[in-house]
């Protein structure tokens, strides 16, 4: 067991694409952990999707033995964290397992919004932060400007920031020396009762749930009986070890160390991220603070395009939930789409990733309904309820008040595009709170916005309005009363539940009109006329018609009596009427996507 003063636990904080995973790769190579033969980009991102999108979704840990220049042998535990705002809770738990962090900033781009959010999380956990300027080999790199930006926006002293190029490996050895010299060693009591923090867990089909943890106090040995605070359940440790970066089995781990255990835990929900492990016979009195249940924020319906795939979808969702405790689902039926599931996600990226994994790993073709958020309702009879599906909203006469979630958003943008950003935020019912310069040409704008307005197309429009230069970060603040209405879409007088949305009263007419027009373009023409109507309650606010396809029934009449032609046309008209009464309109997949793309025009 290494001595505590020779252990360093750290994580790497960076905005997407600033070189976090590349720096981790170089550290593994410089310390000789990964040979040239095993080398591959983004070594710690095990999921194919993580490597393809260039993002880190799950937290990982790796134990790195390092001999410093003074000859001492150290154990460095790198805890790789996700960088995206959706996975904020995972980031906060990973940071709670560390004493220090490397703040990696792209020397050509400067400080971005999500970097700031994660740095503030690190400072909340009292971590020592070392600034690292990456990509200094690029011609566009401006290290002095970026140092100034970091000092201005975060207040970190950058006089001894390390300038590196993770791509070429330049100065990576200096980063390792800085970790050893400047980051504090863990403080834990080996003789105290066991207390260990779970910062990640995943499901393995052979060993059950694998738990990644950091020991705060005490010693954990193979064969010990342990219990978890949140569930009060007890287990026996069957396997104990560390990732270095492949699995190395251990017999014991002490305070300050990071490792994994297997204990025949059957469900991921039993080993929640942020929970505390302790011994059954000598339990700790209080858990590690900061544990909270993760609540889904965004909901949408997922339906198989072929109803025969329903069981396959169910199996796929069960498998995904084993590895993602923040993801929730429950069965639901839709008159338009048949049987499917209502799924809850942490945010938009999370939703995209789950959908992509379902299609890629399980080959399930999906129809996804428009995403919605959780609304709170006070009914006239004094009851309170939460609604995550617009089609479940009660009749407007029964609603006393409707509340929607608001978020506080920080947007970092070059000053050339400030006008576009302000226009977009105002259009999305935002309330401007603050605006200031963090550098001569970069502005940070703070807005409070309804979460429902971000869910649709906000991120895409922000990127296109700023040529990709803007970055954003948001956090949930509270629920506020709003003038919201449910907008129904009727096709030939029948409401299509999967197209119902909750919108602000001021936007209802414009949205209803745009959606009806979009549907007119996507629904194929039928043998009878199709009426598309947008309605609030009983009131129709917009209508579009798709004209019928018709055969030229008078083609066989050459000259002759007009009454003959009229008779044939009347007969056709009767047939169309009967068809309209009996006929069903098949809605293509594009019709449901139309609801997601209304704001694009």
From Swiss-Prot:
Swiss-Prot/TrEMBL catalytic activity: GTP + H2O = GDP + phosphate + H(+)
Please state the Enzyme Commission number of this protein: 3.6.5.n1
Q: Where does GTP bind?
A: 17-22, 134-137
Which Gene Ontology terms describe the biological processes this protein takes part in? positive regulation of translation
Query: A GO molecular-function term, please?
Result: ribosome binding
Q: Does the keyword Cell membrane apply?
A: yes
> The tr-type G domain covers which part of the protein?
5-187
Q: Which Gene3D superfamilies match?
A: 3.30.70.240, Elongation factor 4, C-terminal domain, Elongation Factor G (Translational Gtpase), domain 3, P-loop containing nucleotide triphosphate hydrolases, Translation factors
What InterPro entries does the database record attribute to this sequence?
A: EF-4 (IPR006297), EFG_II (IPR041095), EFG_III/V (IPR035647), EFG_V-like (IPR000640), EFTu-like_2 (IPR004161), G_TR_CS (IPR031157), LepA_C_sf (IPR038363), LepA_CTD (IPR013842)
Q: Which UniProt keywords apply?
A: Cell inner membrane, Cell membrane, GTP-binding, Hydrolase, Membrane, Nucleotide-binding, Protein biosynthesis
State a single Pfam family of this protein.
GTP_EFTU_D2
> What SUPFAM superfamilies has UniProt attached to this entry?
EF-G C-terminal domain-like, P-loop containing nucleoside triphosphate hydrolases
According to the UniProt record, one GO cellular component term is:
plasma membrane
Q: Indicate where this protein resides in the cell.
A: Cell inner membrane
Top-level taxon of the source organism: Bacteria
Bilayer disposition of the protein: Peripheral membrane protein
Protein task:
Required for accurate and efficient protein synthesis under certain stress conditions. May act as a fidelity factor of the translation reaction, by catalyzing a one-codon backward translocation of tRNAs on improperly translocated ribosomes. Back-translocation proceeds from a post-translocation (POST) complex to a pre-translocation (PRE) complex, thus giving elongation factor G a second chance to translocate the tRNAs correctly. Binds to ribosomes in a GTP-dependent manner.
- What family classification does the UniProt entry report for this protein? Belongs to the TRAFAC class translation factor GTPase superfamily. Classic translation factor GTPase family. LepA subfamily.
Protein name (Swiss-Prot/TrEMBL): Elongation factor 4
What's the name of its gene? lepA
